[in-house]
Structure formats: C-alpha cells, structure tokens
Amino acid sequence: MSWRKGIYKLPFRLNFDRFEDVYPQLKNQRFYGFKELSMAPGVNDESLIREKISGDIFNRAGIASSQTAFYKVYINFGSGLWYCGVYTMVEVVDDTMIENRFGEDDGNIYKPESDFTSFVPDKFEKKNNKTEADFSDVVSLINTLHSPLRTENPAQWREQLEAVFYVDHFMKWLAI
C-alpha cells in the first residue's frame, strides 16, 4: 500500500534463525532474545502509536501480547544511509515468544483463516510443530463450540469449553 502511494516505507521482517538449516552454527541465533521481529511502517495509522499502546495495555492487563517499540530505520544501499522513517517493531508470535510468556512452548501456534464452523486443515496454518500432523487441539475446540450440549446442558458445555479454551483470558482480551 505505501509503495503504491509513492512512499518508500515498506514493512519487513528480521528472522535471525532463517538460515539455521543451512548453517547449523547459527541455530537458535537471537537478537536481544528475539528470534524474529516484524517492522511495521504504520501507513494506516497516522498517529503511529495504536499498535504500541494496545500491546502495552494488553501486557499490563496480564494478557500475553507481543512486545513493541519504536525505531528510526535507516538503510544503506551502498551510497550512504537512507532514512526510511519511524517503524513499530512488533515481536513475532513464535515458539520463543510463547516460551518467554508461558514458560513452555509445547503447544501449537496457528494462523487461522477459518470461521470455526468446521475443521479444514488448509485453513489452520501451523507456525510451529509443522512436521506433526496433530490438529487435535483445534478439532476439540471446534467440536466443543458446536456441541449440542451448548443448548441442552449449558453448564456441562461450559465445563467442556473451559477444558480446551481459556475462556477467562479470551473474555479479558475481548473487553480490552
């Protein structure tokens, strides 16, 4: 979008483990504890602070959220530094971030493109544990959401839902 507007300010990612398969000596390479960072140009946010403020609010409320910070970005294309503007650095949700927030990284991280009416594997892209074809956590959530117990026995349905989904955490997130 910014490129079409004639603005030389594009989003980009920094992945510090990108070449660990090719160069094993780079395995688990981190930059100040981060495995991957996303640099957002904020072209749709004239204030440039929405993402930073929302992340801070979530973190202060005890809801796991990506760390954010502001950076002035300069790039050297060989003829000196080119000022690209102020970017919002956003911690990418990955196994490192999950382990830092929850003390473990055993669960799956998904980037869903689903409406959760049914389970379609192509609609749930795994961001970790990609070699394991275990989607039982998502299947269990979808089955619970659509269980007839929802109307027949709401108390039992709620109990089953809370066993597979952090309802209180979600409600807190929704409120903010």
What annotation goes with each model-predicted range?
Residues 1-176:
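Phosphate/dinucleotide-binding and metal-coordinating scaffold of catalytic cores
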